[in-house]
A protein has these predicted regions:
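ATP-binding pocket architecture of kinase catalytic cores
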Residues: 11-103
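A general structural signal for well-ordered alpha-helical segments in protein cores
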Residues: 50, 90, 114-117, 204, ...
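Active-site Asp-x-Gly
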Residues: 169-220
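An alpha-helical support segment within catalytic cores of ATP-dependent transferases
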Residues: 2-5, 98-159, 256, 261
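Conserved N-terminal boundary motif of the eukaryotic protein kinase catalytic domain
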Residues: 4-12
Length: 262
Protein backbone atom coordinates (compact mmCIF):
# COMPACT_ATOMS: atom_id res chain seq x y z
CA UNK A 1 0.00 0.00 0.00
CA UNK A 2 1.50 3.38 -1.05
CA UNK A 3 0.46 4.92 2.24
CA UNK A 4 3.31 3.12 4.00
CA UNK A 5 5.90 4.75 1.75
CA UNK A 6 4.18 8.14 1.98
CA UNK A 7 3.94 8.32 5.75
CA UNK A 8 6.23 5.78 7.36
CA UNK A 9 3.39 3.81 8.91
CA UNK A 10 3.76 0.03 8.90
CA UNK A 11 0.44 -1.66 8.12
CA UNK A 12 -0.50 -5.15 9.28
CA UNK A 13 -3.73 -6.55 7.72
CA UNK A 14 -6.20 -7.78 10.31
CA UNK A 15 -7.67 -11.27 10.18
CA UNK A 16 -11.19 -11.47 8.82
CA UNK A 17 -10.85 -8.27 6.80
CA UNK A 18 -10.56 -8.11 3.01
CA UNK A 19 -7.71 -5.64 2.67
CA UNK A 20 -9.69 -2.85 4.33
CA UNK A 21 -8.53 -2.81 7.95
CA UNK A 22 -5.04 -2.71 9.44
CA UNK A 23 -3.07 -2.31 12.60
CA UNK A 24 -0.82 0.65 11.93
CA UNK A 25 2.47 1.11 13.81
CA UNK A 26 4.79 4.14 13.72
CA UNK A 27 7.31 5.21 16.36
CA UNK A 28 5.73 2.84 18.91
CA UNK A 29 2.29 4.38 18.31
CA UNK A 30 -0.41 1.86 17.42
CA UNK A 31 -3.69 2.74 15.66
CA UNK A 32 -6.59 0.96 14.00
CA UNK A 33 -6.63 2.00 10.34
CA UNK A 34 -9.41 1.40 7.85
CA UNK A 35 -9.88 2.35 4.22
CA UNK A 36 -12.98 4.08 2.87
CA UNK A 37 -15.10 3.81 5.98
CA UNK A 38 -18.33 5.76 6.41
CA UNK A 39 -17.97 9.53 7.00
CA UNK A 40 -20.45 8.88 9.81
CA UNK A 41 -17.53 7.52 11.84
CA UNK A 42 -16.69 10.97 13.24
CA UNK A 43 -20.10 11.26 14.90
CA UNK A 44 -19.85 7.74 16.33
CA UNK A 45 -16.48 8.60 17.82
CA UNK A 46 -17.76 11.81 19.40
CA UNK A 47 -20.68 9.92 20.96
CA UNK A 48 -18.34 7.28 22.42
CA UNK A 49 -19.97 4.49 20.43
CA UNK A 50 -16.83 3.67 18.46
CA UNK A 51 -13.20 4.12 19.55
CA UNK A 52 -11.82 7.67 19.33
CA UNK A 53 -11.13 8.97 15.82
CA UNK A 54 -7.55 10.28 15.70
CA UNK A 55 -7.26 11.49 12.10
CA UNK A 56 -8.52 11.10 8.54
CA UNK A 57 -6.22 11.25 5.50
CA UNK A 58 -6.57 10.88 1.74
CA UNK A 59 -3.94 8.65 0.11
CA UNK A 60 -2.33 9.31 -3.27
CA UNK A 61 -4.60 6.75 -4.96
CA UNK A 62 -7.73 8.52 -3.69
CA UNK A 63 -8.60 6.24 -0.77
CA UNK A 64 -9.76 7.77 2.49
CA UNK A 65 -7.91 6.29 5.45
CA UNK A 66 -9.22 6.73 8.98
CA UNK A 67 -7.23 6.13 12.15
CA UNK A 68 -8.83 5.25 15.46
CA UNK A 69 -7.49 4.62 18.93
CA UNK A 70 -6.20 1.07 19.21
CA UNK A 71 -8.15 -0.74 21.92
CA UNK A 72 -6.75 -3.86 23.48
CA UNK A 73 -9.60 -6.19 24.25
CA UNK A 74 -11.82 -8.75 22.60
CA UNK A 75 -15.09 -9.15 20.76
CA UNK A 76 -18.08 -10.40 22.71
CA UNK A 77 -19.00 -14.07 22.95
CA UNK A 78 -22.40 -15.15 21.68
CA UNK A 79 -23.63 -15.71 25.22
CA UNK A 80 -22.77 -12.10 26.09
CA UNK A 81 -25.30 -10.73 23.63
CA UNK A 82 -27.80 -11.10 26.47
CA UNK A 83 -25.93 -8.51 28.53
CA UNK A 84 -27.87 -5.51 29.76
CA UNK A 85 -25.09 -3.26 28.44
CA UNK A 86 -25.66 -4.43 24.87
CA UNK A 87 -29.38 -3.67 24.95
CA UNK A 88 -28.81 -0.32 26.66
CA UNK A 89 -26.09 0.70 24.21
CA UNK A 90 -28.35 -0.15 21.29
CA UNK A 91 -31.18 1.88 22.83
CA UNK A 92 -28.84 4.87 23.21
CA UNK A 93 -27.95 4.67 19.52
CA UNK A 94 -31.58 4.43 18.45
CA UNK A 95 -32.57 7.36 20.68
CA UNK A 96 -29.74 9.69 19.59
CA UNK A 97 -30.97 12.73 17.67
CA UNK A 98 -27.35 13.79 17.14
CA UNK A 99 -26.52 10.59 15.30
CA UNK A 100 -29.71 10.85 13.28
CA UNK A 101 -28.91 14.40 12.16
CA UNK A 102 -25.34 13.46 11.26
CA UNK A 103 -26.37 10.39 9.27
CA UNK A 104 -28.86 12.47 7.29
CA UNK A 105 -26.15 15.06 6.68
CA UNK A 106 -23.81 12.51 5.11
CA UNK A 107 -26.54 11.04 2.92
CA UNK A 108 -27.70 8.10 5.02
CA UNK A 109 -30.29 5.94 3.29
CA UNK A 110 -33.75 5.12 4.63
CA UNK A 111 -34.49 1.39 4.77
CA UNK A 112 -38.09 0.21 5.03
CA UNK A 113 -39.77 -3.14 5.56
CA UNK A 114 -40.54 -3.57 1.86
CA UNK A 115 -36.86 -3.02 1.07
CA UNK A 116 -36.06 -6.14 3.11
CA UNK A 117 -38.39 -8.23 0.97
CA UNK A 118 -36.94 -6.76 -2.22
CA UNK A 119 -33.45 -7.56 -0.98
CA UNK A 120 -34.48 -11.14 -0.23
CA UNK A 121 -36.05 -11.82 -3.62
CA UNK A 122 -33.22 -10.19 -5.59
CA UNK A 123 -31.11 -13.01 -7.01
CA UNK A 124 -32.96 -15.62 -4.92
CA UNK A 125 -31.98 -19.15 -6.06
CA UNK A 126 -34.81 -21.45 -7.17
CA UNK A 127 -33.95 -23.92 -4.38
CA UNK A 128 -35.01 -21.28 -1.87
CA UNK A 129 -37.78 -19.66 -3.88
CA UNK A 130 -39.75 -22.92 -4.01
CA UNK A 131 -38.83 -24.31 -0.59
CA UNK A 132 -42.16 -24.93 1.21
CA UNK A 133 -41.15 -23.41 4.56
CA UNK A 134 -39.53 -20.37 3.00
CA UNK A 135 -42.45 -19.87 0.64
CA UNK A 136 -44.84 -20.00 3.58
CA UNK A 137 -42.74 -17.41 5.40
CA UNK A 138 -42.67 -15.00 2.46
CA UNK A 139 -46.42 -15.31 1.93
CA UNK A 140 -46.96 -14.54 5.60
CA UNK A 141 -44.63 -11.53 5.51
CA UNK A 142 -46.25 -10.13 2.38
CA UNK A 143 -49.70 -10.51 3.90
CA UNK A 144 -48.66 -8.85 7.15
CA UNK A 145 -46.84 -6.02 5.36
CA UNK A 146 -50.11 -4.45 4.22
CA UNK A 147 -51.19 -3.85 7.81
CA UNK A 148 -47.78 -3.63 9.50
CA UNK A 149 -47.77 -0.67 11.92
CA UNK A 150 -45.54 2.18 10.77
CA UNK A 151 -43.07 3.52 13.39
CA UNK A 152 -43.61 7.10 14.49
CA UNK A 153 -40.10 7.90 13.26
CA UNK A 154 -37.02 6.19 11.93
CA UNK A 155 -33.73 6.12 13.80
CA UNK A 156 -30.09 5.25 13.22
CA UNK A 157 -29.78 1.46 12.89
CA UNK A 158 -26.43 -0.33 12.83
CA UNK A 159 -27.80 -2.93 10.44
CA UNK A 160 -25.44 -5.83 11.15
CA UNK A 161 -26.19 -7.66 14.39
CA UNK A 162 -23.12 -9.71 15.28
CA UNK A 163 -21.23 -10.40 18.48
CA UNK A 164 -18.09 -9.85 16.40
CA UNK A 165 -19.04 -6.19 16.00
CA UNK A 166 -19.08 -5.57 19.75
CA UNK A 167 -15.67 -4.75 21.22
CA UNK A 168 -15.02 -4.95 24.97
CA UNK A 169 -11.79 -3.17 25.83
CA UNK A 170 -9.42 -4.10 28.64
CA UNK A 171 -10.77 -0.97 30.40
CA UNK A 172 -14.28 -2.49 30.15
CA UNK A 173 -15.45 0.06 27.58
CA UNK A 174 -18.04 -1.39 25.21
CA UNK A 175 -17.95 -0.27 21.57
CA UNK A 176 -20.07 -1.10 18.54
CA UNK A 177 -17.93 -1.15 15.39
CA UNK A 178 -18.20 -1.84 11.64
CA UNK A 179 -20.85 0.63 10.52
CA UNK A 180 -20.81 -0.16 6.81
CA UNK A 181 -24.49 -1.24 6.92
CA UNK A 182 -25.84 1.77 8.82
CA UNK A 183 -29.28 3.03 7.72
CA UNK A 184 -32.22 5.07 8.94
CA UNK A 185 -34.87 2.50 9.80
CA UNK A 186 -37.40 1.19 12.27
CA UNK A 187 -35.57 0.28 15.52
CA UNK A 188 -37.28 -3.11 15.18
CA UNK A 189 -35.06 -3.66 12.13
CA UNK A 190 -31.97 -3.84 14.36
CA UNK A 191 -33.72 -5.61 17.20
CA UNK A 192 -35.28 -8.23 14.95
CA UNK A 193 -31.78 -9.17 13.80
CA UNK A 194 -30.62 -9.78 17.36
CA UNK A 195 -33.72 -11.79 18.25
CA UNK A 196 -33.30 -13.91 15.11
CA UNK A 197 -29.55 -14.50 15.22
CA UNK A 198 -29.20 -14.91 18.99
CA UNK A 199 -32.51 -16.56 19.86
CA UNK A 200 -30.61 -19.29 21.76
CA UNK A 201 -28.57 -16.81 23.81
CA UNK A 202 -30.98 -13.93 24.41
CA UNK A 203 -33.83 -14.03 26.91
CA UNK A 204 -36.16 -11.91 24.78
CA UNK A 205 -38.30 -10.43 27.56
CA UNK A 206 -35.30 -9.65 29.76
CA UNK A 207 -33.40 -8.15 26.83
CA UNK A 208 -36.34 -5.99 25.75
CA UNK A 209 -36.78 -4.77 29.32
CA UNK A 210 -33.09 -3.82 29.44
CA UNK A 211 -33.61 -1.93 26.18
CA UNK A 212 -36.58 -0.21 27.85
CA UNK A 213 -38.82 -1.08 24.91
CA UNK A 214 -42.41 0.11 24.92
CA UNK A 215 -43.98 -3.28 24.33
CA UNK A 216 -47.16 -2.18 22.60
CA UNK A 217 -49.00 -4.56 20.31
CA UNK A 218 -47.83 -2.52 17.32
CA UNK A 219 -44.18 -2.77 18.37
CA UNK A 220 -44.40 -6.51 19.02
CA UNK A 221 -45.90 -7.02 15.56
CA UNK A 222 -43.01 -5.13 13.98
CA UNK A 223 -40.49 -7.11 16.03
CA UNK A 224 -42.03 -10.42 14.96
CA UNK A 225 -42.11 -9.30 11.33
CA UNK A 226 -38.45 -8.30 11.27
CA UNK A 227 -37.40 -11.43 13.15
CA UNK A 228 -38.92 -13.61 10.42
CA UNK A 229 -37.56 -11.35 7.70
CA UNK A 230 -34.02 -11.39 9.07
CA UNK A 231 -34.16 -15.15 9.42
CA UNK A 232 -35.00 -15.44 5.71
CA UNK A 233 -32.15 -13.12 4.75
CA UNK A 234 -29.72 -15.11 6.89
CA UNK A 235 -30.92 -18.38 5.34
CA UNK A 236 -30.30 -16.92 1.89
CA UNK A 237 -26.81 -15.76 2.93
CA UNK A 238 -25.99 -19.21 4.33
CA UNK A 239 -27.14 -20.88 1.10
CA UNK A 240 -25.08 -18.50 -1.05
CA UNK A 241 -21.95 -19.29 0.99
CA UNK A 242 -22.63 -23.07 1.01
CA UNK A 243 -23.12 -23.23 4.79
CA UNK A 244 -25.90 -25.77 4.39
CA UNK A 245 -25.78 -27.25 7.91
CA UNK A 246 -26.31 -23.80 9.40
CA UNK A 247 -28.98 -23.04 6.80
CA UNK A 248 -30.96 -26.16 7.70
CA UNK A 249 -30.82 -25.33 11.40
CA UNK A 250 -32.16 -21.85 10.67
CA UNK A 251 -34.98 -23.28 8.54
CA UNK A 252 -36.04 -25.51 11.46
CA UNK A 253 -36.08 -22.47 13.76
CA UNK A 254 -37.98 -20.44 11.16
CA UNK A 255 -40.63 -23.14 10.92
CA UNK A 256 -41.13 -23.01 14.70
CA UNK A 257 -41.66 -19.24 14.54
CA UNK A 258 -44.14 -19.61 11.69
CA UNK A 259 -46.14 -22.15 13.70
CA UNK A 260 -46.25 -19.70 16.62
CA UNK A 261 -47.56 -16.98 14.32
CA UNK A 262 -50.27 -18.73 12.31
Amino acid sequence: MNFEQETGWTLHPLNGETGQAYMGIKNEQKLFLKRNTSPFLAALSLEGISPKLVWTKRTSNGDILTAQKWCNGRTLYKTEMNMVRVAQKLKGIHASETLKKMLKRVGGQTYQAEDCLTNYFTGLPADLRYHPTLSQATKLLKKQLDTLPVPSEYCVCHGDASHKNWLLSDEHELYLVDWDSVVLADPAYDMGQYLARYCKQIDAEQWLNAYDAQLTEAFRRRLDWYRLMMSLLDIKAAYMSSRFHKMNAMIIQLNEWIEETV
